[in-house]
Amino acid sequence: MKLSRQFTVFGSAIFCVVIFSLYLMLDRGHLDYPRNPRREGSFPQGQLSMLQEKIDHLERLLAENNEIISNIRDSVINLSESVEDGPKSSQSNFSQGAGSHLLPSQLSLSVDTADCLFASQSGSHNSDVQMLDVYSLISFDNPDGGVWKQGFDITYESNEWDTEPLQVFVVPHSHNDPGWLKTFNDYFRDKTQYIFNNMVLKLKEDSRRKFIWSEISYLSKWWDIIDIQKKDAVKSLIENGQLEIVTGGWVMPDEATPHYFALIDQLIEGHQWLENNIGVKPRSGWAIDPFGHSPTMAYLLNRAGLSHMLIQRVHYAVKKHFALHKTLEFFWRQNWDLGSVTDILCHMMPFYSYDIPHTCGPDPKICCQFDFKRLPGGRFGCPWGVPPETIHPGNVQSRARMLLDQYRKKSKLFRTKVLLAPLGDDFRYCEYTEWDLQFKNYQQLFDYMNSQSKFKVKIQFGTLSDFFDALDKADETQRDKGQSMFPVLSGDFFTYADRDDHYWSGYFTSRPFYKRMDRIMESHLRAAEILYYFALRQAHKYKINKFLSSSLYTALTEARRNLGLFQHHDAITGTAKDWVVVDYGTRLFHSLMVLEKIIGNSAFLLILKDKLTYDSYSPDTFLEMDLKQKSQDSLPQKNIIRLSAEPRYLVVYNPLEQDRISLVSVYVSSPTVQVFSASGKPVEVQVSAVWDTANTISETAYEISFRAHIPPLGLKVYKILESASSNSHLADYVLYKNKVEDSGIFTIKNMINTEEGITLENSFVLLRFDQTGLMKQMMTKEDGKHHEVNVQFSWYGTTIKRDKSGAYLFLPDGNAKPYVYTTPPFVRVTHGRIYSEVTCFFDHVTHRVRLYHIQGIEGQSVEVSNIVDIRKVYNREIAMKISSDIKSQNRFYTDLNGYQIQPRMTLSKLPLQANVYPMTTMAYIQDAKHRLTLLSAQSLGVSSLNSGQIEVIMDRRLMQDDNRGLEQGIQDNKITANLFRILLEKRSAVNTEEEKKSVSYPSLLSHITSSLMNHPVIPMANKFSSPTLELQGEFSPLQSSLPCDIHLVNLRTIQSKVGNGHSNEAALILHRKGFDCRFSSKGTGLFCSTTQGKILVQKLLNKFIVESLTPSSLSLMHSPPGTQNISEINLSPMEISTFRIQLR
């Protein structure tokens, strides 16, 4: 009876809610379209536009109604479950925390139990080689290996090739950094253009000659200045197999610090350029210079349709171990792959470098003699003291034997009789003389070797795919028996060391200012891409020529290319010359400005009530983002919105595919402010001081903050005005160890001598701080438990040995020393209705911890912001350490490229710097009961050197070069903003065996918190108050949120096949994230559910009709056979899938 009575009451409530909701929606329909006498002059046109909008609006109401019914159904299910579970305290979630915003109860998280199976199954249990195990096996003792210093002596029997000859492919290449010691443009002007020009001439001279090229950024720059004859010559060289484009990305990217969004984007940019200009599809990957290698890159290449890849920079001890076991060629499989769908055949180069002395065989003294650019009389020789000799009939026999001996020895490290011998180095084949020296001397050696049947060798120039095709053929017999001769490997190749204890973990943090700028650029680019495509389709629909004919798409293309260029392994890494860094920064800065314009223009068109009036507005009326950066090396500053009694529009964009309630903060000119929703409802506002200095309040600016509920990928309109009847809430301040002379309108309490503790709380957590303003403890309200979460700062110095830390290397002088201050820091505590925070001011870092009073995702984590300034220190690195009571032992977890989680072990047999790993978006530690996650809005180096600790290196200033070619230290430090979130989650019980798995997944809450932080809402104001301007209340392009575990990576307008303009198609890129279900999903405030990766196309969009949707390979290079329109999207966990979509 009790149950049925509850259902009766609940059913009645639902009926009322539905009726009231429908009434409100219909009422809002009228409110949205008031009569406007201004339109009477062009009545028919305006009326048509409005009629179309009304039809769209009714469709949306219908969709919303369906969504409400769906949510009610879920709520009934949830209610019945909660009744069966017994009564729950209604106070548990909402008992404390001033002003927490309650969410509608029907919008609770619903996870399909089938979606939990993936993470609960162990990943990659069928790998032959698991990198975590390899690190346990290797002793890392580094004995002298003889001529191959880091290896061992290689021997062979002369009859080993009697039955099957050795097949050698010599692959000429030139490694062209798009910026390092010179800028991209300077390298092109001085070197690269000559390589291309000579390539066309010299390859045509002899059809046996081959060459490979990787960086499309350079190829495209050259293509723009050459004539049609040269273009045809290049196409013909590719067609006859003499020239191969390898990888085909815009650059050869770093693999530690970039986010997968940018890795994919530069791959698409390169592949699209190749398709539109040359019509070629790369087959093999070539990564000889990135400083360590990520399985994320292997996955992306596989999904782009490449079948093979090559890597070079791997820890010398790992190379030796692989050489001993002949595992240098392997199928690289993702840790999470339960089958073999992600396998890609990978060749690891065995020796120290990709240069010629280290690629023909184990003895560099001999191999150097076969680099014919080093002949006597040239600009540089062989450091081993024996120069090359020009090949002639008198020495060809002895030289051929010497070279063949090296090839044979090298081949002993592999499982087949097919051998790769790269022939190149940085910016090689620049002079036409080198083409002659290398190709003519080698051809004489080849001709001689091939003529001697006793040598049992077949040798030739080849492309990378020539080599891999032969390798596949050698494995064919084994594969036909159902078992390849190559092992399966899972894991990654960080952290890289090229010799001794020289670990390349410094660059994980080097120049963090630009690492942060990179992520802001990514967020802006993605936001601009999505809004631009929606606006483009509406502009087509309403024939808005001003938008269609604008240069926005050209600017968008340039922004993609500038972001792509920055993913280069000497750019985002922070390992280029100072002026080259300025060049990269300037490119990013200019593109940021342009993207803000694209976002503003696109949003304006989409939110404009009468689309046909778009052409009549000047650009000054368009929406302007609230953040402005003055120069490439300064932090963004907020614009001040000038208020008056005349309302100003404030448009807020949610670039995420999830419905969200987020804080919106803008600066205004007056504290007496009112904010109204589009329907005229007043919005609760917190007014906070804008601080000109640590203890000086601005007299001209005030910060207003309010909660905004914004639809997925949508725009929400608010009105702000100055008003004496303001209902805003002023923040209160408590100051420790300092005081404010003029507090203005704010209540400020000065605490000079007090031992009183500092606390912050909301409805989820209570934080305790010490007198210095540093967090000491977190209490989770869900269970009332206190947890040690202790934040400290510390310094690393550099070793007293000859080799010291530099841009690449981290060589510390032992453990970090605590950050010591002479006078206690000034601490400022803010208590507000929307957020509260503690800010403490140290000499080198301004540290802010903030809690949001938002009942939802934003309220469950702790936001940490550090403004770091180490411009005056000498050979030091500053770190933030979080110490907790979590019993994590020596195990911790870091993400790879924001795509997947890689378990790590802190190994005592390795030096401290070897235990530092790259973190792109998150790192966590855990025990059987809890997980502590540090979410990051920028790539940095991270470690867990002791149980319960996470330490992140935030900036480094180093006075010397580390002897890796840069020839300078890092002394161009900026005032740098680092942004983090700390999330403490309760885990369901797990057994200890599960903790040893080679795979781990974040929780859904962690995933979405990371997305919220990396893709914040974007507030925009119209530049000038315009009384005649009318905007819709909102623009909501999706029918509902995408499933919780599906992320819209991009909606990227595809370039037209003719010219540089846009086509009508876009690349829809979706990522289904793997997540761990063993975390509480109650009260998370997620406005979505999971659907086993299924999305019905007809239920996807609201304002648009999907004209076509077809599957594609990741970078649009390939379409599956028999491709046709699909009506349902099906994504498997962890997969990133691209579709060609056309909307109208």
Swiss-Prot record:
List the EC numbers from the record. 3.2.1.114
Task: Write out the catalysed reaction.
Answer: N(4)-{beta-D-GlcNAc-(1->2)-alpha-D-Man-(1->3)-[alpha-D-Man-(1->3)-[alpha-D-Man-(1->6)]-alpha-D-Man-(1->6)]-beta-D-Man-(1->4)-beta-D-GlcNAc-(1->4)-beta-D-GlcNAc}-L-asparaginyl-[protein] + 2 H2O = 2 alpha-D-mannopyranose + an N(4)-{beta-D-GlcNAc-(1->2)-alpha-D-Man-(1->3)-[alpha-D-Man-(1->6)]-beta-D-Man-(1->4)-beta-D-GlcNAc-(1->4)-beta-D-GlcNAc}-L-asparaginyl-[protein]
Q: Where in the cell is it found?
A: Golgi apparatus membrane
Which residues face the membrane's Cytoplasmic side?
Answer: 1-5
The residues exposed to the Lumenal compartment are 27-1144
Q: Which InterPro entries match?
A: Gal_mutarotase_sf_dom, Glyco_hydro/deAcase_b/a-brl, Glyco_hydro_38_C, Glyco_hydro_38_cen, Glyco_hydro_38_cen_sf, Glyco_hydro_38_N, Glyco_hydro_38_N_sf, Glyco_hydro_57/38_cen_sf
A matching Pfam family: Glyco_hydro_38N
Catalytic EC class? hydrolase
Q: Could you name the Gene Ontology cellular component terms for this entry?
A: cis-Golgi network; extracellular exosome; Golgi medial cisterna; Golgi membrane; membrane
| Transmembrane feature ranges | 6-26
Region forming the signal peptide: none
Pathway the protein contributes to:
Protein modification; protein glycosylation
Please verify whether the record's keywords include Transferase: no
According to its UniProt record, which residues of this chain constitute the active site? D289
Entry's Gene Ontology BP terms:
in utero embryonic development; liver development; lung alveolus development; mannose metabolic process; mitochondrion organization; N-glycan processing; positive regulation of neurogenesis; protein glycosylation
The membrane topology noted for this protein in its Swiss-Prot or TrEMBL record is: Single-pass type II membrane protein
Q: Which cofactor does it need?
A: Zn(2+)
Q: Could you tell me which residues carry Phosphoserine?
A: S80, S82
Report the PTM annotation: Glycosylated.
The annotation note on the cofactor reads: Binds 1 zinc ion per subunit.
GO MF annotations for this entry? alpha-mannosidase activity; carbohydrate binding; hydrolase activity, hydrolyzing N-glycosyl compounds; mannosyl-oligosaccharide 1,3-1,6-alpha-mannosidase activity; metal ion binding
Glycans attached where?
N78, N93, N1125
Q: Which family does it belong to?
A: Belongs to the glycosyl hydrolase 38 family.
Role according to the record:
Catalyzes the first committed step in the biosynthesis of complex N-glycans. It controls conversion of high mannose to complex N-glycans; the final hydrolytic step in the N-glycan maturation pathway.
Can you say what this protein is called? Alpha-mannosidase 2
